[in-house]
C-alpha cells in the first residue's frame, strides 16, 4: 500500500487501502537532533499527542498507538504532567481510576503505585488502592477475551513477611476481591513471582505494589516483546514497554516486534 501525506485529518480516506501520514508541522522547521533530547522534539511530540487525544475525544478515531516518548524531551517541550497516563486522562476528561498495564506473551501486569519515589510507596499500600487495579485488570482482560482471568497479587515486603502491609492491607484486598467473584491469588513474594505466575503459567496476570517489582521481571523475561497499555481511559492507547533507545538511534538495528505487538493489541 502507498503512503500518502495529507495536511488535515479531513483529507484521510479511511476506506482507502493506502496509509496516510498527517503532516501537522504547518511549515514549522523543527530542529531535531538524533539521540538527543531537545525542546523542539518535545514540542512536536506534545503537538501530535494532543491532536490524537482531541480526535479520540471527538470520536473521530477509535484507538491510538505511539512509539516511545523521551520524557526529557517532553519536559523540555513544556509537559507539566508526571507521566503520559496522567496527561492522557486529563485531556480525555477521565476522572476514574487509570492504570498502566504491561503485557508480554498475553501475560498482563498492573501496579498499585507507579512513578513515585520508593520512600512513598508503603503509605499508598491500602486495601482500597490495591482493589482498584485488581478490578480494572480483570475488566480489561475480559474485554480482551480472557474470561475470569487468574490474577496473582505480589507482596510488598521480602518473602511477603518482613512488614505488616501483607497482613493489614494486601491479604484483605485479595479476600475482598474473591468475595466480588474475582479469581485472585497471593500475596506472592516478588523475587519468585514471575517464575510462579508467568514462567510456570499459573496465572494470566499480576498486580504489583510498585513500579520496579513488576518492570524488572517483565523486562528480564520479555524486553524485546513487551507492550504498554494505558488502562482505564475512554479509548485504547498502546505503545512499547521499552524506552526511546537513544543508544541505537540511527543505526538501523531496532527491533520492530514490540511496536508491532502494541499495534496488534
Where are these regions (language model features)?
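Anion-binding alpha/beta catalytic cores of soluble intermediary-metabolism enzymes, centered on
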Residues: 1-265
Amino acid at each position: 500500500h502507498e503512503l500518502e501525506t495529507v495536511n488535515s485529518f479531513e483529507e484521510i480516506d479511511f476506506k482507502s487501502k493506502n496509509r496516510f501520514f498527517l503532516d501537522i508541522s504547518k511549515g514549522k522547521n523543527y530542529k531535531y537532533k538524533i539521540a538527543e533530547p531537545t525542546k523542539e522534539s518535545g514540542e512536536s511530540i506534545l503537538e501530535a499527542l494532543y491532536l490524537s487525544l482531541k480526535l479520540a475525544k471527538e470520536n473521530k478515531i477509535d484507538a491510538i498507538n505511539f512509539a516511545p516518548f523521551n520524557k526529557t524531551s517532553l519536559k523540555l517541550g513544556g509537559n507539566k504532567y508526571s507521566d503520559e497516563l496522567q496527561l492522557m486522562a486529563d485531556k480525555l476528561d477521565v476522572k476514574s481510576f487509570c492504570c498502566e498495564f504491561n503485557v508480554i506473551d498475553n501475560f498482563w501486569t498492573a501496579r498499585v503505585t507507579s512513578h513515585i519515589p520508593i520512600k512513598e510507596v508503603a503509605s499508598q499500600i491500602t486495601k482500597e488502592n490495591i482493589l482498584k487495579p485488581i478490578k480494572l485488570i480483570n475488566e480489561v482482560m475480559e474485554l480482551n477475551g480472557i474470561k475470569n482471568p487468574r490474577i496473582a497479587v505480589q507482596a510488598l515486603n521480602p518473602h511477603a513477611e518482613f512488614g505488616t502491609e501483607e497482613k493489614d492491607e494486601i491479604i484483605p484486598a485479595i479476600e475482598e476481591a474473591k468475595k466480588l467473584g474475582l479469581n485472585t491469588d497471593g500475596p506472592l513474594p516478588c523475587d519468585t513471582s514471575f517464575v510462579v505466575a508467568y514462567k510456570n503459567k499459573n496465572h494470566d496476570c499480576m498486580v504489583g505494589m510498585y513500579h520496579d517489582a513488576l518492570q524488572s521481571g517483565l523486562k528480564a523475561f520479555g524486553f524485546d516483546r513487551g507492550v504498554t497499555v494505558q488502562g482505564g481511559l475512554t479509548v485504547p492507547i498502546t505503545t512499547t514497554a521499552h524506552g526511546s533507545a537513544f543508544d541505537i538511534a540511527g543505526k538501523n538495528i531496532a527491533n520492530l516486534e514490540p511496536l508491532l505487538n502494541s499495534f496488534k493489541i
